[in-house]
């Protein structure tokens, strides 16, 4: 349980973070944890303090699990290697599902949210003689859009 003195200590920092943008990155496995709802409540608290939040999620946990369920080998689960077509299709499926679950959780806390295309990326192409297939490289983040 939080003590009143702890709360006072926290509250003195709030004014310096109002209207700021926090980027929170979470692993996909966390979304399925029973305590994920607490993270969503923390995000709701940040929003109530006029702190903007961008939530970025991974999906490798769900990708591995779906591939195993379907008996389909995957070429790249952690985002660092070559991504083939079948792996890309599975990754898109799990990412869309996960985004939907997160949006539902945010909505249940009266938070409005949207999935964006603020990440500008291009195919990695051929690197050191290796065709990276569907693996991409982030060129930039449209941070003006996120603000």
Regions found by a protein language model. Give the residues of each.
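Nucleotide/pyrophosphate-binding catalytic subdomain
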Residues: 1-147
């Amino acid at each position: 349980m939080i003590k009143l003195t702890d709360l006072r200590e926290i509250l003195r920092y709030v004014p310096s973070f109002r209207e700021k943008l926090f980027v929170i990155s979470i692993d996909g496995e966390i979304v399925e944890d029973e305590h994920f709802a607490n993270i969503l409540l923390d995000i709701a608290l940040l929003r109530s303090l006029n702190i903007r939040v961008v939530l970025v999620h991974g999906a490798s946990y769900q990708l591995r699990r779906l591939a195993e369920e379907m008996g389909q080998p995957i070429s790249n689960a952690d985002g660092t290697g070559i991504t083939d077509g079948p792996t890309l299709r599975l990754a898109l499926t799990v990412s869309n599902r996960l985004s939907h679950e997160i949006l539902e959780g945010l909505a249940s806390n009266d938070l409005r949210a949207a999935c964006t295309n603020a990440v500008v990326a291009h195919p990695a192409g051929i690197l050191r003689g290796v065709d990276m297939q569907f693996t991409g490289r982030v060129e930039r983040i449209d941070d003006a859009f996120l603000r």
